[in-house]
Amino acid sequence: KASVGFKAGVKEYKLTYYTPEYEVKDTDILAAFRVTPQPGVPPEEAGAAVAAESSTGTWTTVWTDGLTSLDRYKGRCYHIEPVAGEENQYICYVAYPLDLFEEGSVTNMFTSIVGNVFGFKALRALRLEDLRIPTSYTKTFQGPPHGIQVERDKLNKYGRPLLGCTIKPKLGLSAKNYGRAVYECLRGGLDFTKDDENVNSQPFMRWRDRFVFCAEAIYKAQAETGEIKGHYLNATAGTCEEMMKRAIFARELGVPIVMHDYLTGGFTANTSLAHYCRDNGLLLHIHRAMHAVIDRQKNHGMHFRVLAKALRLSGGDHIHAGTVVGKLEGERDITLGFVDLLRDDFIEKDRSRGIYFTQDWVSLPGVLPVASGGIHVWHMPALTEIFGDDSVLQFGGGTLGHPWGNAPGAVANRVALEACVKARNEGRDLAREGNEIIREASKWSPELAAACEVWKEIKFEFQAVDTLD
């Protein structure tokens, strides 16, 4: 006999893992899952299955269960609520004991919580909507290399959003031509330029050549403008060793910031790079390439607010967070919800903005949200109002598409931003008077006037796919 109390066979998950009377602990990691069970599967069983399969459970009773304390280690589905307006869809709340997770490892946390359970047959679909990271777990992470305040101090830039530009065409330029475009944009008044996320080290432009020409552009623009400038040098590579080699070379060149694609590169690589950046005084810009594969479907996958929280733990000083007004997906309330999760120290539960749990980040620095994708000078008042000062506004085509060239495109964006910040500080309503503010500024800035003329008809108006219930 394996053990006296052992009874072989399959038993319902809800007998062990559905515990509505459970009182959550301050140290538990809490998860809110949107569960769509298969027909005939009751929500209690579905919620319990999620808790089991993402913690200690498996499909049958095993005698080694008797060798440990399941009550101490199991995940528990402690609350279930139907989703309003949806048939057979439920929000299931699961509590995980902290001992299930390795300290300081987003990789391990995700392997458990969003691992095999997402392929589970009893569920038609499953989406992780939000996580509550307890302070005791948060304190095991370094988090962002520097954070918002240290970045402002390094750059000596206060009281306004920062301006960026992604260099286009994203692929095909030689390193010297690329560096020239960087110089022109920085010289015209931008704070940053950016490697596109898919610029790594391709045959037409090897990484080392790009780094050298971009560094030259930065130093030249700094000398001419008296402002600190940066270019997000993409260190993403095929191996962690190669990624670190690129980051080290960037530091040797004396540039202020590097960049990483954190989802395609992976959380382990990202956390290593973030640690290096803090130790060596480099800022870290994070691109979220591949996020929509994970977060765009409303009933399956993982919401971006979870990916944003994971990034704050893993480490990054900037992250792309949608624009609300440009060409890429992002509903206003939802976007502002995870923008607050990135920047603020303490965020109250607020279901109207998709925030399922109160989150306390204790001592973790904040992350600057980056608005990028299909934005131009006419969007500047809305962006300034929506995102406030602690943000990076990135105009790729909206700089390089200027009819007079790159530097005048940068001038137009800087003038528009300064005009919006000045108007806001004078108490004007950017939402209502935005167009007028831009028109007034364009009277004394021919560069802005030309930009206004080119983009006056451009709109990206489609319904957001991911909306609040």
From Swiss-Prot:
Its cofactor is Mg(2+). One of its GO terms (molecular function) is ribulose-bisphosphate carboxylase activity. The disulfide bond which can form in the large chain dimeric partners within the hexadecamer appears to be associated with oxidative stress and protein turnover. Keywords: Calvin cycle, Carbon dioxide fixation, Chloroplast, Disulfide bond, Lyase, Magnesium, Metal-binding, Methylation, Monooxygenase, Oxidoreductase, Photorespiration, Photosynthesis, Plastid. It is an enzyme of class 4 (lyase). Its main location: plastid. InterPro entries: RuBisCO, RuBisCo_large_chain_AS, RuBisCO_lsu_C, RuBisCO_lsu_C_sf, RuBisCO_lsu_fd_N, RuBisCO_lsu_N_sf, RuBisCO_lsuI. The modification N6,N6,N6-trimethyllysine is found at residue 7. Pfam families: RuBisCO_large, RuBisCO_large_N. GO terms for cellular component: chloroplast. The active site is at residues 168, 287. The record marks 327 as: Transition state stabilizer. Belongs to the RuBisCO large chain family. Type I subfamily. The basic functional RuBisCO is composed of a large chain homodimer in a 'head-to-tail' conformation. In form I RuBisCO this homodimer is arranged in a barrel-like tetramer with the small subunits forming a tetrameric 'cap' on each end of the 'barrel'. RuBisCO catalyzes two reactions: the carboxylation of D-ribulose 1,5-bisphosphate, the primary event in carbon dioxide fixation, as well as the oxidative fragmentation of the pentose substrate in the photorespiration process. Both reactions occur simultaneously and in competition at the same active site. This is Ribulose bisphosphate carboxylase large chain. It comes from Pachira aquatica (Guiana chestnut). The gene is rbcL.
